[in-house]
Amino acid sequence: MKQSHFFAHLSRLKLINRWPLMRNVRTENVSEHSLQVAMVAHALAAIKNRKFGGNVNAERIALLAMYHDASEVLTGDLPTPVKYFNAQIAQEYKAIEKIAQQKLVDMVPEELRDIFAPLIDEHAYSDEEKSLVKQADALCAYLKCLEELAAGNNEFLLAKTRLEATLEARRSQEMDYFMEVFVPSFHLSLDEISQDSPL
C-alpha cells in the first residue's frame, strides 16, 4: 500500500503563525484558527437554518471551514496587506493557492480523493457555502483583534477597523445574530464570563 504525506503535511499547520507582521500578545497558528472558523461557521449555518429559514448542511460547512486554509501548509500565511496589495498580486496568489490545493488533493490516496477534494478545493464550494465560511473567517479574525485589544495591544486597532468593514460587506442575518448573542462576551474577563456558571 502506497504511503501518503497528506496528514503529515496538515499536521504542520500548527507551525504556521498568523498575523506575522504584527506584534501579538498571544500568537495564533493556522491549525487553531481553522478549528475556531469551523466552530463559528457551523454556528452560522445552524443559526441560518433554525432562525432564518435556511437549508444548509451545517456539518459540511464545518468541514469546509476546517480545511479552508489547508493550502497554507504549502504556501505559508501571506500577510493581508501583501496578498491584496493590488489586483495582479491577488490574482496571482489565488492561482498559487489553486495549485497548492491540487497538490494536497493529489497526496490523498486515489480511493479517498473524491471525499477530500471537495473539502480542499474551494471551487467545489457552492456560493452559499463559500459565503458562510468567509463570514466565519472574517468573524474569527475580528475576534482575534478584540482579544489583542483587550490585552492592551493597540497594534490591532486598524485591523479591527478594516475587519469591521469586511464584516459589513459580508453581513447576513445569521452574522447579526452571532454578533449580538456571542461577540459581547469577548470583551469580558474570565471571571465575568464564569460568574453565571460556577463549577
Swiss-Prot record:
Name all HD domain ranges. Answer: 30-142
> Could you give a GO molecular-function term held by this entry?
metal ion binding
> Which residues carry the site feature described as Appears to be important in orienting the phosphate for catalysis?
R18
Q: Which cofactor does it need?
A: a divalent metal cation
State the superkingdom. Answer: Bacteria
- Compartments (UniProt record): Cytoplasm
Instruction: Kindly give the InterPro entries that the UniProt entry links to this protein.
Output: HD/PDEase_dom, HD_domain, YfbR, YfbR/HDDC2
Supply the alphabetized keyword list: Cytoplasm, Hydrolase, Metal-binding, Nucleotide-binding
Q: Which reaction does it catalyse?
A: a 2'-deoxyribonucleoside 5'-phosphate + H2O = a 2'-deoxyribonucleoside + phosphate
- Annotated positions binding a divalent metal cation: H33, H68, D69, D137
Q: Major location, coarse class?
A: cytoplasm
Q: Which HAMAP family match?
A: 5DNU
Looking up NCBIfam families in the UniProt record yields: PRK03826.1 (NF003009)
What the protein does comes down to: Catalyzes the strictly specific dephosphorylation of 2'-deoxyribonucleoside 5'-monophosphates.
Cite the record's note on assembly.
Homodimer.
Protein name according to UniProt: 5'-deoxynucleotidase YfbR
* Phylogenetic placement of the source organism: Bacteria, Pseudomonadati, Pseudomonadota, Gammaproteobacteria, Enterobacterales
